[in-house]
Curated annotation (Swiss-Prot):
Subunit: Immunoglobulins are composed of two identical heavy chains and two identical light chains; disulfide-linked.
Location of the protein in the cell: Secreted; Cell membrane
Protein purpose: Immunoglobulins, also known as antibodies, are membrane-bound or secreted glycoproteins produced by B lymphocytes. In the recognition phase of humoral immunity, the membrane-bound immunoglobulins serve as receptors which, upon binding of a specific antigen, trigger the clonal expansion and differentiation of B lymphocytes into immunoglobulins-secreting plasma cells. Secreted immunoglobulins mediate the effector phase of humoral immunity, which results in the elimination of bound antigens.
Modified residues annotated as Pyrrolidone carboxylic acid in this record: 1
Region entry Variable (V) domain, involved in antigen recognition, spans: 1-124
Constant (C) domain: region residues: 125-547
Protein name from the UniProt record: Immunoglobulin epsilon heavy chain
Main location: secreted
Gene Ontology annotations for the cellular component aspect, listed alphabetically: extracellular region; immunoglobulin complex; plasma membrane
UniProt-annotated glycosylation sites, renumbered to this chain: 145, 173, 219, 265, 371, 383, 394
InterPro entries in alphabetical order: Ig-like_dom (IPR007110), Ig-like_dom_sf (IPR036179), Ig-like_fold (IPR013783), Ig/MHC_CS (IPR003006), Ig_C1-set (IPR003597), Ig_sub (IPR003599), Ig_V-set (IPR013106), Immune_Resp_Modulators (IPR050380)
Amino acid sequence: QVQLVQSGAEVRKPGASVRVSCKASGYTFIDSYVGWIRQAPGHGLEWIHWINPNSGGTNYAPRFQGRVTMTRDASFSTAYMDLRSLRSDDSAVFYCAKSDPFWSDYNFDYSSSEEGTEVTYTVSGAWTLPSVFPLTRCCKNIPSNATSVTLGCLATGYFPEPVMVTWDTGSLNGTTLPATTLTLSGHYATISLLTVSGAWAKQMFTCRVAHTPSSTVDNKTFSVCSRDFTPPTVKILQSSCDGLGHFPPTIQLCLVSGYTPGTINITWLEDGQVMDVDLSTASTESQGELASTESQLTLSQKHWLSDRTYTCQVTYQGHTFQDSTKKCADSNPRGVSAYLSRPSPFDLFIRKSPTITCLVVDLAPSKGTVNLTWSRASGKPVNHSTRKEEKQRNGTLTVTSTLPVGTRDWIEGETYQCRVTHPHLPRALMRSTTKTSGPRAAPEVYAFATPEWPGSRDKRTLACLIQNFMPEDISVQWLHNEVQLPDARHSTTQPRKTKGSGFFVFSRLEVTRAEWQEKDEFICRAVHEAASPSQTVQRAVSVNPGK
């Protein structure tokens, strides 16, 4: 029997390499050409190359030229494919195939493969996560005397394989029947069926879907059948502000009303992450045939003023309902705007002299005095601040007040407030700032020189990608032979959100021909609170190719 057996599925990072083997048996290895074909999600079959096992001659598809090498070891009846410089679009199902004996290299087509095997190779981050759906019958369609019932779990739209589907059946015994199919889009779908017997009517079941390549897990808990129900209305209300300018905790009240009585679960999220806090949840109240309940979340001013989004998430009958809230942008009288900036990581961790700045813009010139007053939420005294006024070309006035803060005070989470008053303002403007809360992640730094470009022979561009850091506060410097360059020498973008939960920035530095001909070294340095041990991560790059 003819068999072609490939090496197992693998996950590789972008830029890495992978070696695939295909061992043949059941025929004379040197009599038939061996080749590889791949199918990426949402695409058709694509020929990569073939090899003549007898002579070692190869033929490669143009788009893979230079990135693929095919070899063979006739003594082991094995062909090898080495794929280099992997990209995200290299994630695909790869098929190893053989030709009819002694076929011409001009008539290769996919239908000529007598035997073939498939295996999936994935570039890290290029996978698609499964969507998971419970499959149940309507309760009214299940006979009252039924001794067993079948329910299912559908995982669809994922790539690559595999997923593992398991069930939590409590004290009941069950049997499962998994089935996997490849959809027209190139993604996979799996259905797992569970048949249970016994006292199943009031039992809840959990379907656990684990996507092995991405190391993600999705759980769905549901009952054996679905009933008609009225879904809840979810609304968040919050306590009123203190008009005296004080900063008491705020109360977020989540009202869940108008739903058919049944089990309900309420969870609070902060920027999409489950909050580990003590909640006050009222007991369910009946409203005729419907029910209502509520959950209360208390937030400190530090958290509320951090501009984070808070979500009340309600799980009911296998469905999710939610409402979200965040601090509204402060309204400013007469177009006046006030901004409060946090200290830069460079000032905080390198210079050890952090400052925060209160900036007031678009003030109309008048004889009255603009007062900027600093305070701390702890009530402790503040340092002496410096003040600067500047008249703009449009006739408005800009006022800046800079306050030195203690490094330890800032790191430990002190909240600072700037209060702006003026005789012509109907009310004071209040701004607060504190250390960003939430998860921490150190930056990844990649520095490289761009290729020379025609017409730019007197210059060379160095680039620095800094990514996957949290929170977003970061400082970027360039060093030339270990001497820091002025900020005016380079351009750095503002932090932007990645598709995940982190941030990234891109920095660009132009160097002269004289600098790179001296074989000088340039360093891109990122200063961030999560970097260890000294809050800095740096990468060196030489624009001289011989270095």
